[in-house]
Amino acid sequence: VFKIKISIDALVNSHYNLMCHCAYISNFNIKRNFTEQKEETAFWSVEVKELIYLPIEKLTEGMELARNIPGINPMLPFAVTGCKLSERMIGRMKTIGVQGAYICTSITQGIEPEDFVEPELKAKMLTSIRDVFDQSLKKFTFQSSRQVYEEIAKVAESVVMNVLNKDKYLFQMIDIRDYDGYTYSHSLYVGILGVLLGKYIGLSISNLNDLALCGLLHDIGKTDIPIDITNKPGPLTSDEFEIMKQHPSLSYKKLGDHIVISQAVLQGVQTHHEKFDGTGYPFGLSGKDIPLYARILAIADVYDALSSTRPYRKAWSPRRIFDYLTSCSNTHFDPELLTAFLHCVSAYPIGTIVHLSDGSSAVIKDNTPGFSLRPIIRFISPPQKAGIDVDLSSELFNLTIIDDDEC
């Protein structure tokens, strides 16, 4: 815990979102500071608490939330920053599919996770995506289809600007989401991940906007699939899977019939389940015959899906996801794009707790591009190592992270 001073003017002019960054007003003692011009400036004394991310099974009663837990409505959180967890709350979080939470601690001073998308912007994006999907369930009119396009185009532009404004290519986000909101958050993150990869390989802003639209709309055809199939809490039967396989073409038709959108976007949406070796659907395209946007979306789609807890399975561990993606190079995925993608994402986001091969525990301090599975860590146990920082990408340290499913 440490204290900083922030000018009230700075708070107003810079729109500091203290709650989202785990800052708490500890003393409402206004100090007077007169400049040479005798202008008066007031300061708040602000106490900033550090945080770590813990998976749901590690949460215990009495822990203090360091960030909001979103509810079904993105604008209305299930639990707010600063509240103390109870056993009942933890049980409810498990029921709605929350994977973990940021918790206040004094262990990680100087380690601050950076939101890839600011929470307020993310909530607005998710609300817009939900509105678009809800509208797609109704009969489109000329006016409603134009409104849908304008709304989703604004989200796409926000996604692109958000990615372009990031200095780092590394995507590191722990998404605290519920089952009911999966479709919307999945669409958003496929858009973000696609644009991130597109930026890395040098696509133009116009192409990035198209790519964002592809990601945001790639699953909109699922609104025409029976809900007992899309929301089935278990593996699909072969007949159900054949119905589910129709969603790329349904997305293409729904968008093509009602919304003025580029052919490149439509093709990307329609072919995002094609595989590099020709075994995908709906057309069995292979290699570079698959549109570029679709080859990018294929990677982003699978990565986000495996990173997410679903009603019928837990989220995969980072190492398992990376191993799976690598094993699918040149079969499911374009190998060049996959190599680039793995440079763009971090397996272990800053602030997460990990276990190491020597039995010690650590918190992720930072990540190095190209070494996603070997980040910079800070030991938290055993006591004789606590507080020591180590870069696992260095050959000097023969340590590896042991994922939960390996313990």
Which residues does each PLM region occupy?
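Short flexible coil/turn linkers enriched for glycine and charged/polar residues
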Residues: V48, N73, K166, I261, ...
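Extreme N-terminal basic, low-complexity initiation segments
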Residues: F2-I6
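Divalent-cation-assisted or electrostatically stabilized phosphate/pyrophosphate-binding catalytic cores
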Residues: K232-K253, K275-R378
